[in-house]
Regions:
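Extracellular secretome segments
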Residues: 2-287
Length: 287
């Protein structure tokens, strides 16, 4: 039991250090594949052999489950039916998250039904958001009212005051305001994206499954894929000479190795220690 407590304390320290690194981590998350994913899990980048400042080849992660009978969030263990204090959750879409230990431990959260999900486009209206809200908080309707709003030019697109957007090459979500100046380091209108990986995919992490991404691996994963009876590892060539390895289920892979998934998804050991997958969108073989 003491060893479990020690590992939990060490993991919490890792999370504290990651938080102290602040903007440097955030910049890396927006520019480097898998960095945001690993940052959220409290992992740290391993130094490159050439000591360059290029994107990390691999990360070192704390033990995500020192005790497999507990849920873990940001290094803190939660027993069955324990709830994460809302002030500790950095994702406004994750509310009232409680640990459930039935089989493998996992978190269950309250379902949030945003009106924009059920009522998509509003004619002559702009949906407005607040930085710490999950759903839209209001509407601005009518030509004159909309014309009076400030605008933000971001990545070739125009956003109206109150609209949310995610700038390219960043791991941030922002709200268009009159103070927007093209930078994302102002906490008044931008915050780091938190994918809620430990909250929504607790059991997948425990089983050493692989995150699945669409578009690029600098955004949040859309899910995980896990080993199955038909999983096959195709050995590749480690052209970068990375010594770190990936773990997929109970299998160990070298950088360059690939894992068979399905016709729409390709998985590989690229940035250890997790295998990562890319899903085609759209998939030509989907029905």
């Amino acid at each position: 039991m003491d060893s479990v407590k020690t590992r939990s304390t060490m993991k919490a320290v890792v999370y504290f250090v990651a938080l102290m690194l602040g903007s440097a981590w955030s910049d890396m998350a927006g520019e480097c594949d898998m960095a945001g994913f690993y940052m959220e899990l409290g992992c740290t980048p391993l130094p490159r052999p050439d000591n360059s400042t290029a994107c990390p080849d691999a990360f070192q992660c704390p033990d995500l489950h020192p005790d497999p009978s507990m849920c873990y969030y940001r290094g803190v263990p939660y027993g069955d039916r324990s709830t994460i204090p809302q002030a500790l959750i950095n994702n406004p879409c994750s509310q009232a998250c409680r640990c459930t230990v039935a089989g493998e431990p996992r978190f269950e959260c309250a379902a949030l039904d945003c009106v924009e999900v059920f009522n998509g486009d509003l004619q002559q209206c702009v949906r407005t958001y607040e930085l710490e809200s999950c759903c839209s908080t209001g509407n601005v309707c009518g030509k004159d009212a909309i014309a009076s709003l400030k605008t933000c030019e971001v990545d070739g697109k125009t956003y109206m005051e109150g609209e949310s957007f995610e700038p390219k090459n960043s791991h941030k979500t922002c709200i268009c305001t009159g103070e927007w100046n093209g930078t994302t380091d102002n906490a008044a209108y931008c915050r780091d994206i938190n994918c809620g990986i430990e909250i929504h995919y607790q059991e997948k992490l425990l089983d050493n499954c692989a995150p699945v991404f669409v578009g690029d691996r600098r955004r949040c994963p859309i899910g995980f894929t896990c080993p199955s009876a038909t999983t096959r590892v195709v050995r590749g060539l480690n052209v970068r000479g990375v010594n770190s390895e990936c773990v997929f289920g109970n299998r160990t892979l070298s950088v360059g190795d690939e894992v068979t998934a399905d016709a729409c998804t390709t998985c590989a050991c690229d940035v250890p220690p997790f295998v990562s997958c890319m899903m085609k969108n759209p998939c030509p073989n989907s029905t």
